[in-house]
Regions:
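Metal-associated gating/positioning segment near the N- to mid-region
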Residues: 59-127
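Hydrophobic/aromatic beta-strand patches that form the interior of the parallel beta-sheet core
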Residues: 8, 52-54, 66, 122
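Histidine-rich, glycine-flanked metal-binding segment
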Residues: 2-5, 13-62
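Short, positively charged
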Residues: 1-11, 87-90
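Conserved beta-strand segments that form the floor/walls of ligand-binding pockets within enzyme
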Residues: 7-8, 27, 67, 92
Length: 130
């Protein structure tokens, strides 16, 4: 099954190279960016009839952000002490503990991060007794 081309058009685009286009377009094919550029006088070119189009007029379009140090899912939102697995205190040194065992994948922090533009995160434990 052939996937349709996806076009995000009309939004203010921040590029990885530092260029900013007040009105631009992004063409995505098979999940990868194929082309992007500024829009001049409307659409970037005649769009394919079967293309999926997202009108981003008035919106900011930018690459996903990377959170390089966080405790998302380990220090859970709205859980208080019960949801805080950041620092384990059962022993003075706990090399046998892994942060992946403490992560709650349905923690609201992940949704909040996505809404803020974070698409990748390096999640680690606390440093109190590692």
């Amino acid at each position: 099954m052939e996937k349709k081309m996806l076009y995000i058009i009309g939004g203010k685009i921040l590029t990885m190279t530092g260029e900013i286009w007040d009105k631009g377009y992004i063409c995505i094919e098979n999940g990868k960016i194929k082309e992007l550029g500024p829009m001049v006088d409307g659409a970037p070119f005649p769009l394919p009839e079967d293309a999926l189009v997202i009108n981003a007029l008035g919106l900011l379009v930018m690459p996903g952000l990377i959170e390089a140090h966080c405790h998302m899912g380990i220090t859970e939102e709205k859980k208080g002490m019960e949801g805080d697995d950041c620092n384990e205190t059962v022993d003075p040194i706990t090399p046998y503990l892994r942060s992946m065992d403490a992560i709650n994948p349905i923690d609201a922090a992940f949704t909040d991060a996505l809404r803020a533009g974070i698409t990748s995160a390096m999640i680690g434990p606390g440093s109190a007794n590692v």
